[in-house]
Each structure stands twice: as C-alpha cells, then as structure tokens.
C-alpha cells in the first residue's frame, strides 16, 4: 500500500485540491484557547513520570494541547452516554449495561504515541464522568519471538502480519460486547518478547485506549473477495500522532543512542549486544533498523491509515504539536 501524500509525510492543507474538506484544522494557539479556562490536573512531577525517553513533554504542552484533547474526548464520551439512554428509551426496554468507550491511538515508532496514550489516560481519569480508564498496547498481541522466527517474520516485527490479528480483534470485540472481564497479553520491552502466562485484566472500565502502530488498518480482503471486521470498526474515536518522516527517523536514532546508554546496559536486555557499540556503530545500526524495518513499515502500513483518524496531532521537530486536524461531524 503506497504512502499517502509527499514522501516526507507532510500533511496537505485541509482544503487541498477541493473547495471544502471533511476536516477542521486549528493551529496551536487556536487549539490551546479551547481549554484556556480549564485547570490542568497534572503536576510537573506527574508529567515527568509519564514522559517517554526523548519526549519534551512539559506543563505548557499538556495545558495547550492535551487538556483540550481530553476535554473533547470527554464530550464524545458524554454524548455516547446520551445516545445510549436515548436508544434505551426508543426501544422501550432496559438495555445491557453500556459498553466502554474505545479510543484507538496510532502512529509511528518513536513519534511519541505511547506518551500521548499515557497522558490521555491520566487526564481522562480526572474527569468525574469517567474515572476508570484502561490503556492496552498492541505489543502484547505480537506473536512470540519463537513463532516469528518459525514464520520468518522476526525482521518484520511490527508489520501487520507479525501480530495475532485474530486475537487482537477478539479482544476489542469482547470489550465492546460488554464482557465483565477481558484479558490482554503482556509484552516486555526488556526481553523484546511476549511474557508467557502473564495477562492484563480489563474489568469494564469507562474508557479503553488501544495504542499501537497498526490499530487503524483497514479490513483485509479475504481470498474469496470478502472483507471482514477490523479493529477500527469498534472504535468510538481515533487519534493519529504525526510528524514528518525525516523528523521521526531522527527521533528514532536519538532514542536508540539514549537506550544504548541506559536500558541496553541491562545484561538481561534483548538489546544488550548494542551497549558495547561505539557511537558511530550505534548510529549506523539505528539507521539500518529504521531504513529496513521501521521506515518501510511506516510508509507502507502506518502512514496510509492517518486519514482514517478522527483527530490528527501534527508534531514539530521539538516534539511540540504544531496543529490539530479534527474530522467534521
């Protein structure tokens, strides 16, 4: 699947090539003004705890960008609740309990989507209407390394085919079916593998955030020409964290060099072999991994799903969000 737009991943203007657009686009100052009178519930210490390696997240970014996002999401959740009650009244019968509101969050490796997911989880839980917010990453649904090796997919880890897509879809379907308890597998970034027999238990939260590279992938076409269900069929809202591809590549290389000095020093790390590399060798290896795995996956599978998102957060080189694009209702 070809990447959409220019090769560097620049978003065209919302009204490019047409008189009107299905998107609203707001620059940073216009977006920040939407929550200027809402108090930021997170302290500087909490923000430091939520920040990922290399992210420049600070109080200003949370106040100006993520507070309006959390308020918008809260409005969507409240609206879904009103629709649930209206449907119950229309049917003249009691319905099963309302199912969790599911948010899909996508974006490239190293773009900061995990930090975005953690911040939104924390902020959404501060709104009194929905205090119970669960976060699940799709990493746990990767096939174990042994299975990836057996299939010849270890060098394509992160590509759509490296995930147990049937299990991931069943997980989200179970959430939206209102099951009292749903289990998700656990992934260890230290050992770079799924943790056997370790599960995350999801017990009917108000909101579930599903974060991962490929969560906005369209349904696959089957051999008989039919298409089945896909994850985004069960999302109530979706977010894509975006930046120029060349910028994300630089962030990935910088993060790799930081990990070489930190997590890779752990002898139990899958990547411990990189700890002894010189800076030049580590940089060359990071660039190789990006150019052969992460970059192609972004171009072929992740970036083309950007237009499927309800909300796009476009970042600048300093990691700050420059503008926001929201799909019109």
From Swiss-Prot:
It catalyses: (R)-pantothenate + ATP = (R)-4'-phosphopantothenate + ADP + H(+). It is found in: Cytoplasm. GO terms for molecular function: ATP binding; pantothenate kinase activity. Its EC number is 2.7.1.33. GO terms for biological process: coenzyme A biosynthetic process. InterPro entries: P-loop_NTPase, PanK, PRK/URK. HAMAP family: Pantothen_kinase_1. Belongs to the prokaryotic pantothenate kinase family. This is Pantothenate kinase. It comes from Nocardioides sp. (strain ATCC BAA-499 / JS614). The lineage of its organism: Bacteria, Bacillati, Actinomycetota, Actinomycetes, Propionibacteriales.
């Amino acid at each position: 699947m070809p990447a959409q737009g220019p090769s560097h991943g620049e978003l065209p203007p919302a009204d490019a090539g047409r008189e009107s657009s299905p998107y609203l686009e707001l620059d940073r100052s216009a977006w920040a003004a939407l929550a200027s009178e809402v108090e930021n519930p997170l302290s500087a210490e909490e923000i430091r705890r939520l920040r990922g390696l290399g992210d420049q997240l600070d109080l200003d970014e949370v106040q100006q960008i993520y507070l309006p996002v959390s308020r918008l999401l809260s409005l969507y959740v409240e609206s879904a609740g009103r629709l649930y009650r209206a449907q119950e009244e229309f049917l003249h019968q009691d319905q099963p309990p309302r199912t969790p509101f599911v948010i899909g969050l996508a974006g490239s490796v190293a773009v900061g989507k995990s930090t975005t997911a953690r911040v939104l989880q924390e902020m959404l839980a501060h709104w009194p209407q929905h205090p119970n917010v669960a976060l699940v990453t799709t990493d746990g649904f990767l096939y174990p390394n042994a299975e990836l090796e057996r299939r010849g997919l270890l060098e394509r880890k992160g590509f759509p085919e490296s995930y147990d897509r049937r299990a991931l879809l069943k997980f989200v379907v179970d959430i939206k079916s209102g099951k009292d308890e749903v289990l998700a597998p656990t992934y260890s970034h230290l050992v770079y593998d799924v943790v056997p027999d370790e599960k995350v238990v999801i017990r009917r939260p108000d909101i579930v955030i599903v974060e991962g590279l490929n969560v906005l992938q369209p349904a696959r076409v089957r051999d008989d020409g039919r298409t089945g269900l896909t994850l985004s069929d069960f999302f109530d809202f979706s977010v894509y964290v975006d930046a120029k591809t060349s910028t994300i590549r630089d962030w990935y290389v910088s993060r790799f060099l930081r990990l070489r000095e930190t997590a890779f020093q752990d002898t139990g790390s899958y990547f411990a072999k990189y700890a002894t590399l010189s800076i030049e060798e580590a940089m060359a290896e990071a660039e190789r991994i990006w150019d052969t795995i992460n970059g192609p996956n972004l171009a072929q599978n992740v970036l083309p799903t950007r237009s499927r998102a309800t909300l796009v957060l476009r970042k600048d080189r300093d990691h700050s969000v420059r503008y926001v694009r929201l799909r019109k209702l």
